[in-house]
């Protein structure tokens, strides 16, 4: 959400932001038909922004809650390419797995991931170290092995979630890092119940809770016995697939 808004602020005169989360009115707008002129009029009113071609970025957030809005991207592309639209969905992988129509060939798809190590170095204002990795000059890299090890250990501790990296960049406070990480994990867990059937929820939580135990083993093979004694794959395949579709 922040990234889309920042992109709009940087490259467009105006940004019209629409979220479909708990927004039945806007979901209904797209359920009616794919008349782009009518849709734009509704987006104007909802966002409070006068949408004009070329210089307004239309942001459709939590689009997995409005399947027809996702499908409408095909018609924006074919019938009204002068309107610039960007969309995001936190559980879009789950939505697509459940059969929501996807506008194949009409959109550019971008998956977002946590920072990798090189991006982490740049965030820590260590562009020199990052550039040296690009050269693959291992004599040069070896000269600064102590610096790479220092930052690699910090990267392993902080991970790559942007809020965590930003806090560490500003304060270098390991306790603050751990608190933010814990908050993110709790937010994930709190989100589970909003998007899945109640009967599947306990199994998803059990798989999720078993992940640290799975990773702590020397043998990295996934053992269902780490979830619960006597567990079988058939009991948890839906839960595992759901977490995979979420990108978790």
Question: What role is predicted for each listed range?
Answer:
Residues 3-7:
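Hydrophobic positions on the alpha1 helix immediately C-terminal to the Walker A/P-loop
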Residues 9-27:
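Conserved catalytic segments around the Walker B and adjacent sensor/switch elements
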Residues 22-56:
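Short glycine-rich substrate-engagement loop in P-loop NTPases that contacts/grips substrate
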Residues 59, 84-90, 111, 120:
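Structural recognition of the conserved hydrophobic beta-strand(s) that form the central parallel beta-sheet
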Residues 70-87, 91-93:
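Conserved catalytic/switch belt of AAA+ P-loop NTPases
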Residues 75, 93-109, 121-126:
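Short regulatory helix/loop adjacent to the ATP-binding pocket of P-loop NTPases
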Residues 111-163:
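Amphipathic alpha-helical segments of the small helical/lid subdomains adjacent to P-loop NTPase cores
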Residues 161, 166-248:
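Accessory nucleic acid-recognition modules appended to NTPase machines
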